[in-house]
UniProtKB/Swiss-Prot annotation:
BP-aspect Gene Ontology terms: proton motive force-driven plasma membrane ATP synthesis
PANTHER family xrefs: V-TYPE PROTON ATPASE SUBUNIT B (PTHR43389:SF4)
Organism annotation: Deinococcus radiodurans (strain ATCC 13939 / DSM 20539 / JCM 16871 / CCUG 27074 / LMG 4051 / NBRC 15346 / NCIMB 9279 / VKM B-1422 / R1)
Function: Produces ATP from ADP in the presence of a proton gradient across the membrane. The V-type beta chain is a regulatory subunit.
SUPFAM superfamilies listed in its UniProt record: C-terminal domain of alpha and beta subunits of F1 ATP synthase, P-loop containing nucleoside triphosphate hydrolases
Keywords from the UniProt entry: ATP synthesis, Hydrogen ion transport, Ion transport, Transport
GO molecular function ontology, one term from the record: ATP binding
Similarity remark: Belongs to the ATPase alpha/beta chains family.
Protein's recorded name: V-type ATP synthase beta chain
HAMAP family: ATP_synth_B_arch
InterPro entries noted in UniProt: ATP-synt_VA_C (IPR055190), ATPase_a/bsu_AS (IPR020003), ATPase_F1/V1/A1_a/bsu_N (IPR004100), ATPase_F1/V1/A1_a/bsu_nucl-bd (IPR000194), P-loop_NTPase (IPR027417), V-ATPase_su_B/beta (IPR022879)
Amino acid sequence: MTLLQKEYNDVAYISGPLLFVNAASDLPNGAIVNIKDGNGKLRGGRVISVSDQNAVIQVFEETRGLDLATASVSLVEDVARLGVSKEMIGRRFDGLGRPIDGLPAVVAEQRLSVDGQPMNPAARAKPEEFIQTGISTIDVQTSLIRGQKLPIFSGSGLPHNELAAQIARQAKVPGHEGDFAVVFAAMGLTQREVSFFTQEFERTGALARSVLFLNKADDPAVERLLTPRMALTTAEYLAFEHGYHVLVILTDLTNYCEALREIGGAREEIPGRRGFPGYMYTDLASLYERAGVVEGKPGSVTQVPILSMPDDDITHPIPDLTGYITEGQIVVDRTLNSKGVFPPINPLPSLSRLQGNGIGKGKTRADHKNVADQLFAAYANGLDLRKLVAITGEDALTETDKLYLKFSDDFENYFIGQGDQDRSIDDSLTVAWGILSKLPQSQLTRLSKDSIDKYYGTKMDEMWKGGRSSI
């Protein structure tokens, strides 16, 4: 009898979604198994822990109806694998890679381990090519670079789903539009959110260049742990086998981490900070570090993970550990959202550590870096003056101070609050110059004289103030 035919019948006990099987130490960790009940019904599962005494299996479906005396386990695959193909573009799948769009299953060109292959650090190329998202605050002030991992920190009730859909719809690498693809993985979605993403991708035509993996809130927790790995395996295949520049959007990583905590609790592991497992940093790194550019390979994998910070706390373990691994952050702001500004991205706490690699002359525009610095300084000054006015009133302000107050309002309404507009980097810089031109030239200390001579005096346009289409 071979291992592939072997059945394990000594199920010791069942705890929630977990099966503990005795005398199964020869099962590979991470293997996919079938669990058969006394009536012959099969359920899928994954081995999540193996010791000398037993194996722990997370069941993909409910464990109701499983009996210790009649349940048996058999090996299906030594590791979780996904059948991948270029034909996956334009398709929708569930969190385990099964089609949910009513079309036949994809004919796999390869079956790849969802854990991926480690990327040789010596083979990594330096990320230095600009990705245009069409969103001014990101493109000008926290630029996304091909091969980067740049998370979005949001909060409960903020429009990060709409922002994710807008990035998926608009993102492109200038000059490489034909070989650009989006892999979108959403975890822990409500039925309303599933409908939103499905309709939004179809309505805007973004589905034609996208692969969607949608995991619902009522799906098993272990499926939530596999969903981003399914997405990243697909992205790596498209990038390094077919030369695509792939943007991977993962939302919401908070749901992923809570599934990690749920399984850790069921396994009776010793918890770490706020109940999350101590290995959460390593687990998140195994996702984030799959982004990058490889020497000699035409494609690339860029990641934009999105997470909602519990209680808007940026020191919470999930954003805290994410910040250690990734290369910056984009912060969605509740105050801006309450003013009706969309997308409500606050540039002051936002940062892209690789921005300097991919902007400037020959990449975006020569004045890009200086304009970003000037916008940051002027907006920060305007917000400080708002706090002062709240205490002392406007009587103590100079004329220049009043111009800075007006600048901060215009910056939020015209530059940040672009709505559903898809702006090129030139369009975004034009908007920036139109707002900066309301300040005296003497205040533009971060801009070169050549840039001021060329662009100062750009007229503002009411069309810059964006609106939002109703879905």
